[in-house]
Design a protein with these regions (language model features):
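Small/aliphatic-rich secondary-structure junction motif
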Residues: 7-61
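Conserved acidic residues
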Residues: 15, 116-118, 146
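Acidic, proline/glycine-rich short linear motifs
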Residues: 7, 49-76, 159-165
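Short, well-ordered secondary-structure micro-motifs
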Residues: 30, 57-60, 107-108, 131-132, ...
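Structural beta-alpha unit
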Residues: 1-8, 86-119, 159, 165
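Glycine-rich, Arg-bearing micro-motifs that act as flexible, cationic patches
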Residues: 118-143, 156-162
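General small-molecule cofactor/ligand-binding pocket signal
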Residues: 46-48, 94-98, 150-152
């Protein structure tokens, strides 16, 4: 796994940039940054949305209805963001829909798909702390992540990102 990623990282094409899709404001910056890098390096984008199962621990019928609604919302968010990725890069992204703890599922996905060569996350710059995924991946989860992590500040404009990429 590691050897394959090392060989891909030296190439100017074939890189896959993983972006975790959620409803945060900083998703825009992370995804725009990833698209600009992928376009420049002839790479691809992978989008992952993770449905948290703890949201469905109610009565069986209500829980199942909530699960279906969450899946519809996830599929819609992936569709909308996939269209934007295609508009920015000219390529359709790889799309992953998972259920579980995002901290676990992002590591699992990276370990399963050796094409993924970098993880791009957006950071909340309006609050007092980062989100739970960034907090985890920059502390004890860092040892589990086999690819570099790029954290894009949520206060960057598209023009700022254009200059950086």
């Amino acid at each position: 796994m590691v050897d394959r990623r090392k060989s891909q990282a030296g190439q100017e094409d074939g890189r896959v940039f993983l972006v975790v899709v959620d409803d945060s404001e900083e998703l825009h910056q992370a995804l725009y940054f990833a698209c600009r890098r992928a376009k420049r390096l002839n790479g691809r984008i992978a989008l992952m949305y993770c449905i948290r199962p703890a949201e469905f621990q109610h009565f069986a019928g209500v829980g199942e209805l909530m699960r279906e609604e969450a899946r519809e919302q996830a599929e819609n968010m992936l569709r909308v963001n996939s269209e934007w990725v295609h508009d920015l890069t000219g390529k359709n992204p790889m799309v992953y829909l998972r259920e579980g703890d995002p901290r676990v599922e992002v590591i699992n996905l990276i370990n399963e798909d050796e094409q993924i060569s970098i993880l791009i996350l957006g950071a909340n710059t309006k609050g007092d702390s980062t989100g739970p995924l960034i907090r985890y991946l920059t502390t004890k989860g860092a040892a589990e992540c086999p690819v570099p992590i790029t954290i894009v500040p949520g206060n960057l404009s598209d023009e700022d990102i254009d200059r950086l990429t």
